[in-house]
């Protein structure tokens, strides 16, 4: 147990048998007003906002699966989702982590049961998958190690469902400074990986960055990466604009 004497964030390092692990830890203040003001006014709003999408129904994602963690769960089960991005297939698990991909200790929920990711993608019949994973690994594991596990997941999906198009979404920043720096480094690895392999790369994270590179207070519900309704609406707009750009 760690006892906080004041609000803020720090790092904890543990070592055992020659192995060292470091993680970021935050302690938020009690009220929402205190939380909103803790990091100062420069953290209130994002540096960029997406343009207003063109009106009309969006069906681009109706044949897509969305692979992710609890943040993706927020996206897919928020009121207004169908009007914003249609009816994608949810392939997620709360607290999802790519660390559990190589040994199948982490799988996704599909049709009310636990499936290996690649088998769920193949069985779902989707033509494309949108993937945002890695946030729960960063802060515990390095961007490079997280990326290696991400590649393993993609390799398995391509082997099992080679016809499916891969869309990689950049991972959202955190309210924690060190984790946001790790996330930025991880996103750069994903961006280059997508370019090298002709995958699609969807720039989501840049619309969720305050001037200090962290998640804006107005978008963060918990000081990390879980979203407020305002943040979810922003993500909807990013995806709507992306769909419209692909259909032009």
Question: Which ranges hold each PLM region?
Answer:
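Extracytoplasmic soluble-region selector
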Residues: 1-38
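A structural signal for isolated positions on well-ordered beta-strands in alpha/beta enzyme cores
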Residues: 65, 130, 165-167, 200
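Active-site segments of SGNH/GDSL-like serine hydrolases
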Residues: 155-185
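Catalytic His-Asp segment of secreted/periplasmic serine-dependent ester chemistry enzymes
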Residues: 174-248
């Amino acid at each position: 147990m760690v006892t906080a004497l004041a609000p803020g964030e720090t790092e904890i390092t543990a070592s055992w048998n020659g192995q060292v692990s470091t993680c970021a830890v935050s302690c938020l203040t009690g009220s929402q007003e205190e939380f909103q003001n803790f990091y100062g006014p420069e953290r209130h709003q994002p540096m960029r906002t997406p343009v207003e999408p063109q009106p009309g129904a969006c069906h681009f994602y109706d044949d897509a699966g969305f692979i992710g963690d609890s943040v993706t769960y927020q996206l897919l089960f928020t009121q207004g989702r169908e009007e914003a991005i249609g009816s994608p297939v949810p392939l997620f698990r709360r607290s999802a982590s790519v660390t559990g991909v190589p040994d199948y200790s982490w799988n996704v929920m599909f049709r009310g049961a636990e499936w290996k990711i690649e088998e769920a993608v193949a069985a779902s019949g989707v033509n494309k998958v949108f993937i945002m994973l890695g946030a729960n690994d960063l802060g515990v594991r390095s961007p490079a190690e997280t990326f290696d596990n991400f590649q393993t997941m993609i390799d398995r999906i391509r082997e099992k469902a080679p016809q499916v198009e891969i869309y990689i979404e950049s991972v959202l920043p955190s309210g924690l400074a060190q984790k946001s720096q790790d996330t930025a480094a991880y996103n750069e690895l994903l961006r280059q990986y997508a370019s090298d392999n002709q995958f699609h790369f969807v720039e989501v994270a840049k619309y969720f960055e305050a001037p200090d590179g962290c998640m804006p207070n107005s978008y963060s519900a918990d000081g990390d990466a879980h979203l407020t309704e305002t943040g979810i609406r922003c993500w909807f707009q990013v995806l709507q604009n992306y769909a419209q750009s692909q259909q032009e």
